[in-house]
Amino acid sequence: MTFSRPSGRTADQLRPVRIERAFTRHAEGSVLVSFGDTHVLCTASVENRVPNFLRGKGEGWVTAEYGMLPRSTHTRSDREAARGKQGGRTLEIQRLIGRALRACVDRNALGERTITLDCDVLQADGGTRTAAITGAYVALADAVNLLLKRGEIKKHPLIGAVAAVSVGIYRGEPVLDLDYPEDSDCDTDMNVVMNDGGGFIELQGTAEGHAFRRDELNALLALAEKGMGDLFALQRAALAG
C-alpha cells in the first residue's frame, strides 16, 4: 500500500510558509506567519525596563505571551481572560517561545530593556507553537534592527537565527510539519527548536500511541534538520526584503 498524507505532501515537505513583515503599525516588530492554514500574528514590543531580578545588572530580557483567538479552531473557545486565568497549555507554550528566543540573544548587548513577543493564533491547523517561534524571531530581528537604527544600542544583540518545526510518525512513517489531521492521528509528535548553526535548543517529543524506536527518532531529527534549512532560508529572505 502506498503511503500518502492527507494534504498530498511528501514526507519531507513543509506546508507553504509565508512571512509577512510590518503587518501592524505600532509594534517595533510585527509579522504574520503562515504555515499552511495555521496563521499566527507575532509582535515585538520594546520597553525600557527589566524584571526586578535583572535591575542594575545591565542585561536585557526577552519574554513571550501566547494566545488563541476564540474562533481560531473549529469550535469557539472562551477567552482565557474571561475564565480569569491562563491554561496550562498556554503557559507551557509561551515559556517555550521565550526560552527559544532568549537562546539567540546577547542580553548584555540589549541593555536594560525588555522585548516581549506576543504570539496570537488567528487560525489553527496544527503547529501553532512552531509557527509562533519561527515568526517571532523575525519580529524580534526587526525590533532590534530598529533599536540599532535609532542608536539606542551599539552592538547587534542577535547571535543567530531560531526556528521551529514539528515532526511525527503518521501511519508508521516519519513526516515533517504535521497539520491538524495528522497531529490528531499520529503515533508520535515532536516539536524541534534549532538555531541556524545546527544546534538544538529544545526537543519536545511524545509517543501518542506506540513507543518510538531510536532509529525512528534519528529519522525524525533528520527531517527536522531538513525543514529547518528551508525555514532559515525563508527567514533570511523575509528580512532581506
UniProtKB/Swiss-Prot annotation:
Molecular-function GO term, any one: tRNA nucleotidyltransferase activity
Task of the protein: Phosphorolytic 3'-5' exoribonuclease that plays an important role in tRNA 3'-end maturation. Removes nucleotide residues following the 3'-CCA terminus of tRNAs; can also add nucleotides to the ends of RNA molecules by using nucleoside diphosphates as substrates, but this may not be physiologically important. Probably plays a role in initiation of 16S rRNA degradation (leading to ribosome degradation) during starvation.
Pfam families xref list: RNase_PH, RNase_PH_C
NCBIfam families associated with the record: RNasePH
Key words, A-Z: Nucleotidyltransferase, RNA-binding, rRNA processing, Transferase, tRNA processing, tRNA-binding
Biological-process GO terms, alphabetical: rRNA catabolic process; rRNA processing; tRNA processing
Protein name (database record): Ribonuclease PH
EC number: 2.7.7.56
Lineage: Bacteria, Pseudomonadati, Pseudomonadota, Gammaproteobacteria, Lysobacterales
Family the entry assigns: Belongs to the RNase PH family.
Quaternary structure note: Homohexameric ring arranged as a trimer of dimers.
Species in which this protein is naturally found: Xanthomonas oryzae pv. oryzae (strain PXO99A)
Transmembrane segments: none
Binding positions (phosphate): R89, G127, T128, R129
Coiled-coil regions listed in the entry: none
